Amino acid sequence: MKARLWQTLFLLNTLIISEVSFAEDANKDVRDLKEQNIMSVLYQQTAAERLASSLQTFSSAKRALDIALADPSWSALPGQNVKDKKTAIIVDIDETVLDNTAYEARMILDGTKYPQGWVSWGKEEAATEVPGAKDFLNYASSKGVTIFYITNRVVELKEATQINLTKLGIPWDKTKETILMRGENNWDSDKGSRRALVAQEYRVLLMAGDNLGDFVDAKYNNLSPQKRKAIVEEYADYWGEKWFMLQNIAYGDWEGALYDFNYSLSPDEVHNTRIESLEPIR
């Protein structure tokens, strides 16, 4: 009897140890994968070069805004009918206006992965300003231009986002719906329908974002890296004139494109795909 009892206890102990070991290995895989992002997040948070790039982008956008206001035929939306319309700009929020690199740093240090902790982070209302964003947006507002924020933050974060913007002195119109969130009105992550909604009443003078999908519809964004580059080249005349891209080397659809937008890959598969995507010249 004692022998059978000890045998049972031994088996249970082995199973528990195996399960704990498996969980620890899984957490280690996630941690190792996130640690590959350390240099990216450090660049976003500490590099003088990133600061210069961001200030440069918004300074260029400010000059472009003056040109756009002086030209009644100007539009940042290809083929838009601009007759008798009010003026507006469209900007993304995350990594365009609000800097969430503190959340990225947390994930690295805690060994977690998105979307773990994302909603909680948003509700802290602690994101900082992307350098140059506030100055540019206040300038646009002073010119009577309506600012539309088209973001893929979930609608649950709407109030927290509004508070975060207000804390930073970033303008948003409280008299109309100008912060358009994912999940509102059946909007999905494709921002095209929201841009089209704005275009019904407004002449869109320029757009700013950190992701190709902030400028083009999903069918042109959710492609291979090579095809996404071809789309960028197709709109070469828009960049720096009507469309303004902010640097974000920490995350984005540029990474999803490496995996063919298959987010069910294991950490090992993600790591291997990253390695295979490198292009050395020897």
Regions found by a protein language model. Name each.
Residues 95, 133-166, 210-212:
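Substrate-recognition element of Asp-dependent hydrolases with the DxDx(T/V) motif
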Residues 89-100:
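Asp-based phosphoryl-transfer active-site loop
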Residues 1-9:
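Bacterial N-terminal signal peptides that target proteins for export
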Residues 43-54, 119-126, 148-154, 183-184:
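Second-shell loop/turn segments in exported
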Residues 22-91, 260-282:
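Non-catalytic pre-domain segments flanking phosphatase-related domains
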Residues 104-129:
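Metal-dependent phosphoesterase signature
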Residues 27-28, 158-282:
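C-terminal cap/substrate-recognition subdomain and adjoining C-terminal extension
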Residues 9-18:
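Bacterial N-terminal signal peptides
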